[in-house]
A protein has these predicted regions:
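N-terminal targeting/anchoring "stem" of glycan-biosynthesis enzymes
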Residues: 2-566
């Protein structure tokens, strides 16, 4: 039994010894395999880490480059012009946000706009627009009994109709100097004088200067100087016949010193309305150098070389070049773009008397500007004869901020990839005001981005000539949007697109009063409701109707004598 036990014990010892030997061998194999796996894992993790490090480095470089590039563009684009630098503080200001909740909703919604993005989403109904055609350029016969002998000379800014009414010679207009814009441009610097005179020769006799025997007269001393204050804004033709005409016969000359919106209100005879349209839409052609640079601007925006529509033909004439834009810049089809006139310059902001959440510093700054440039308005404020900021906003008298414009475009369905040409002068508040816009719409360009400094040099310090370039880019755009329908450039572009657009020139015109009412609910309104109300607001302005009484024919030319309905 002891032997047996010994055997068993020995067997057991051999068993356990053998078992222990197998464990030693298995442990060595697993250890080697584990080490191999560990080395492979470390290699993979190291490789992935290198990729992440390289990717991070590249993103940092690209981000730095984009920030530097965008920063330089924005500094160049939104910087204050030198001629008003002393009036506007140049230090960086904090970003101005008035509607944080709506802006966040717009930011979340804009990606969905890309799915069904179509830049021409607000075309006017073709079957209605096609029935209206320009007709003010049809020649008139001189009425029987009307003499070709003229009653005298009129020195006037924009009164072709007055010269025709009073049977007088019209002296080429002289532009008044503005302390705001500091522009010395005259008529011949912007428009082709000879073409203007030739085109209207059957309607009005136009001369470039007074005859020598009248040049030496002291026009004010003889009582022939008439200022804007002497004529009521809505004076009728009868006023000019009863008051101005006898003065013209007596002295042989009348100088209207300033003529803003005079003889521009209903009721006007059909033939005078027709003449006003003929002058505005046909007789005024930009000088060749403006046409040439305007053509270059449009071609570079579109990345396309040829004329595309009737608006190109009327605005650019023979100056739509056929040479390539650049070797690598010509596309098979043109880039579509939306032109936006952001009328948020300091003069507009100050004159509106609105509050834009800029705090006490902004209020003091705007008040100081008004005291220099708008003394009459300043006096009204002191006498409590002006609207409060809240009243101005509720009545739709405040220009849209860049933030409000971005929210509106998002509600209308425009995606973040929309190519936007920004017209206008320098945005009040600079980059701090534009950040909310460019975050939603990064593809924003201006003429300063598109044209080289040498190409812009001839127009430097001539705001009227720079505005002519903006007019061309806006008028020929696939879509034109405005932030203030009362501004002169927006009104003229709107009318020009209606008159010459031939059914393919959609324009977005917000009703500022309605939009202000919608925005007043910004803390509670849901995005779907906001979007539908904004779209309805714009679509209702797309209705094709004849010009109502009292509306400007330059902005709404669908009226007898200007456009004819067939």
């Amino acid at each position: 039994m002891g032997k047996e036990a010994a055997k068993k014990g020995g067997g057991a010892g051999r068993y356990y010894a053998a078992k222990g030997g197998e464990n030693n061998v298995g442990c060595g194999k697993r250890h080697a395999l584990f080490c191999n796996h560990l080395r492979m894992a470390l290699f993979v993790f190291g490789l992935m880490g290198s990729f992440f490090l390289l990717d991070s480095l590249m993103l940092t470089v690209i981000h730095h480059f984009n920030l530097h590039r965008r920063g330089s563009l924005q500094r160049r684009r939104w910087i204050v012009p030198q001629n008003v630098e002393s009036e506007i503080p140049t230090e960086e200001r904090a970003e101005k946000i008035m509607y944080a909740r709506l802006l966040a909703l717009a930011s979340a919604a804009i990606s969905k706009n890309e799915i069904h993005d179509s830049i021409e989403r607000f075309n006017e109904p073709y079957n209605q627009t096609s029935s209206w055609r320009p007709c003010s350029d049809r020649e008139n016969q001189i009425p029987q009994g009307r003499t070709r002998t003229r009653s005298g000379y009129i020195l006037v800014c924009n009164a072709v109709a007055v010269a025709a009414l009073l049977n007088a010679y019209l002296v080429i207009p002289k532009f008044l100097y503005s302390s705001v814009w500091k522009d010395t441009s005259q008529f011949g610097d912007i428009y082709q004088e000879d073409f203007f005179m030739s085109y209207l020769k059957n309607d009005v006799d136009i001369v470039k200067e007074l005859p020598s025997h009248l040049q030496s007269l002291d026009i004010e001393a003889i009582g022939s100087l008439i200022t804007d204050n002497d004529i009521r804004k809505e004076s009728t033709p009868e006023y000019f016949l009863q008051v101005v005409f006898p003065l013209l016969l007596k002295n042989g000359v009348v100088h209207f010193y300033g003529f803003g919106n005079r003889l521009a209100f209903d009721p006007l005879p059909w033939d005078l309305q027709k003449l006003r349209c003929k002058c505005n839409f046909h007789a005024l052609k930009y000088v060749p150098r403006i046409q040439e640079i305007g053509s270059l601007l449009v071609r570079r925006i579109r990345k396309h070389n040829s004329s595309l529509n009737m608006l190109d033909e009327h605005l650019l004439g023979k100056h739509m070049p056929h040479a390539p834009v650049s070797r690598n810049d010509t596309c098979t089809s043109p880039v579509k773009y939306l032109a936006l006139h952001m009328r948020f310059e300091m003069d507009m902001v100050a004159y509106s008397l609105c509050d834009f959440d800029g705090g006490e510093n902004e209020r003091k700054e705007l008040q100081a500007y008004r005291e220099v440039h708008f003394p009459t308005l300043t006096m009204q404020i002191k006498n409590n004869n002006s609207l409060s900021p809240e009243e101005s906003r509720s009545l739709g008298k405040c220009p849209l901020t860049p933030e409000e414009a971005a929210i509106m475009l998002t509600a209308l369905g425009y995606g973040s990839r929309t190519y936007i040409y920004l017209a206008g002068s320098r945005i009040y508040g600079g980059q701090s005001r534009m950040l909310s816009f460019t975050r939603l719409y990064p593809n924003v360009i201006t003429k300063e981005d598109i044209l080289t400094p040498s190409e812009l040099a001839p127009f430097k310090n001539f705001s009227s000539q720079l505005a002519a370039l903006d007019f061309i880019a806006c008028a020929t755009a696939d879509v034109f949007a405005m932030t203030d329908s009362g501004s002169q450039l927006s009104s003229l572009v709107n009318g020009y697109r209606i008159y010459h657009g031939r059914d393919h020139a959609p324009t977005i015109r917000p009703n500022k009063k309605r939009f202000a009412r919608i925005l007043s609910e910004n803390r509670t309104i849901q995005w779907h409701d906001f979007r539908e109300r904004v779209r309805k607001m714009v679509q209702e302005n797309q209705r094709i109707i004849a010009r109502r009484k009292g509306r400007s024919i330059y902005r709404l030319p669908r009226t007898p004598g200007c456009m004819c309905k067939y």
